Each structure stands twice: as structure tokens, then as C-alpha cells.
């Protein structure tokens, strides 16, 4: 994306969008990934996903279920003010094995059930970079499928298992991001900062519809504006997104 722009959180007030971009012409910087408890790359075969949402100011993350000293503290809200989400992979007693938002992509750890509220989502998004398609499913049903723009060769869209962290409205279909942007839990491997943001990737609309189907972004997935409108008003925070 070219610049920081005013946006509206779909359930809160005005903030600023700074996810890693999908328009050309801006510079970013690379850097090493931070250390984290573990990684996961593949999605389980299931139609309903359990999501843990933070209930307090922060969530302690542990390397193992029985550990007493956390290795990471995750803020209770995302950059854009949404209650922090974690994708639940497994559970053991009072602990939950989760996919953690942030670098490096695919990081996992254990959190305490007492620190979160559990929810379920039945939608999932799949992005096929080779075919340049995005598919939204609800259970076994395909809700929509569309052609997308993906990351350019020097800033490819990262692959892996992610989830929705933020749902943002720009208020302008002619904006660089189109009318909506969806923040994801993943980050660009090439850009540690971009347009005032920290290299977070997302799915958003565009004011350059001719770019759809091309490899032209700085890592985000760019979709037609009618599609991003459907996505942003359909999928909740925590919805799993698999990019391959």
C-alpha cells in the first residue's frame, strides 16, 4: 500500500491502517524474525474452528502447556483495537495450544484458558498463489471464488496458516485499499516496515481493478471491491486463512 490512510474499524472508532502493502512504489526494509515458541504450517481438515479472544490487557504465551514462565506476552488488543485473537489447535487441561499472531509466521504456543473467551467460526479462506485465486467456504459450501492480485517477486505473499485479526472500513471505494481491508495474523518476510506500518499482511480491495490477476503487491492479497465488501461483512475475527 502506498500510504497511511484514515480507516474505520467496523466495530469501533477511527484508526489508521498500516498493513504491508499491495500498491507499487514504496520502499520497505527487511530484518530477522523474532524468536517464538514454535511454528505450524499446515491447516487441519475441519469445518469449524475454535478461536480464543483475549479478555484482559494481555495474554501470556508459554512454550509448553505445563510451563510456569511465559516466553511471550501478547497485548489484549490488536493494533487496530480488536480483542486479540488466537487460533486454537489443541488443548490440555486448562491450557490451549494456539497459533499466535506476529513474527515469525506460524508461531505457536500455549495460553491459559482463563485469559480468553472461546468462540467458533465456520468460514475459512483459501488463497492459491499459483492460480491467483481466493475461495471463501462455509463448511463444505463455496461462498465465493475470485481472481486476486498477489505479491510481486521481490515482495511475495507469505504462505502458511493465518487468521483474521482486524476488519477495517476505509469509507472510500476509490481508496488504494478499496472500501475495506482485512488484517491478517501474518507478516511480510521482506518488509519489516511499510507506509507507517510494521509489514502486516492483509486482504483488501483496490482502486486499480486492472491489477487483479497480477503479481504486483508488496505482500497483500488484492481482490475486487465487491469481493472485499462481501468478505469484510461476512467473516469474523479469527476466521482461518490458508495461503499456499
Q: What spans do the regions from the language model cover?
A:
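Exported/periplasmic cell-wall-interacting domains
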Residues: 38-39, 115-124, 152, 161, ...
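A mature extracytoplasmic/lumenal domain signature
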Residues: 65, 92, 100-104, 115, ...
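Bacterial signal peptide processing site
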Residues: 23-26
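C-terminal motif of bacterial Sec signal peptides marking the signal peptidase cleavage site
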Residues: 18-21
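Beta-loop motif signature
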Residues: 38-87
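Bacterial N-terminal signal peptides that target proteins for export
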Residues: 1-10
Amino acid at each position: 500500500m502506498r500510504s497511511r490512510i484514515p480507516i474505520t474499524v467496523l466495530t469501533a472508532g477511527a484508526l489508521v491502517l498500516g498493513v504491508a502493502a499491495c500498491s507499487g512504489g514504496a520502499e520497505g526494509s527487511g530484518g530477522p524474525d523474532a524468536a517464538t515458541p514454535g511454528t505450524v504450517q499446515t491447516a487441519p481438515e475441519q469445518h469449524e474452528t475454535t478461536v480464543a479472544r483475549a479478555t484482559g490487557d494481555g495474554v501470556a504465551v508459554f512454550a509448553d502447556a505445563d510451563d510456569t514462565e511465559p516466553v511471550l506476552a501478547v497485548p489484549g488488543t490488536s493494533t487496530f483495537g480488536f480483542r486479540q485473537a488466537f487460533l486454537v489447535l489443541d488443548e490440555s487441561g486448562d491450557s490451549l495450544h494456539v497459533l499466535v499472531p506476529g513474527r515469525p509466521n506460524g508461531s505457536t504456543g500455549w495460553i491459559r484458558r482463563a485469559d480468553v473467551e472461546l468462540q467458533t467460526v465456520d468460514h475459512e479462506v483459501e488463497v492459491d498463489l499459483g492460480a491467483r485465486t481466493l475461495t471463501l467456504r462455509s463448511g463444505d459450501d463455496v461462498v465465493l471464488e475470485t481472481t486476486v492480485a498477489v505479491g510481486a517477486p521481490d515482495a511475495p505473499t507469505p504462505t502458511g496458516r493465518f487468521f483474521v485479526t482486524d476488519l477495517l472500513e476505509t469509507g472510500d471505494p476509490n481508496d488504494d485499499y478499496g472500501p475495506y481491508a482485512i488484517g491478517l495474523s501474518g507478516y511480510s518476510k521482506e518488509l519489516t516496515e511499510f507506509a507507517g506500518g510494521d509489514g502486516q499482511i492483509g486482504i483488501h480491495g483496490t482502486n486499480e481493478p486492472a491489477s487483479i490477476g497480477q503479481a504486483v503487491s508488496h505482500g497483500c492479497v488484492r481482490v475486487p471491491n465487491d469481493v472485499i465488501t462481501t468478505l469484510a461483512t461476512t467473516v469474523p475475527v479469527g476466521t482461518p486463512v490458508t495461503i499456499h
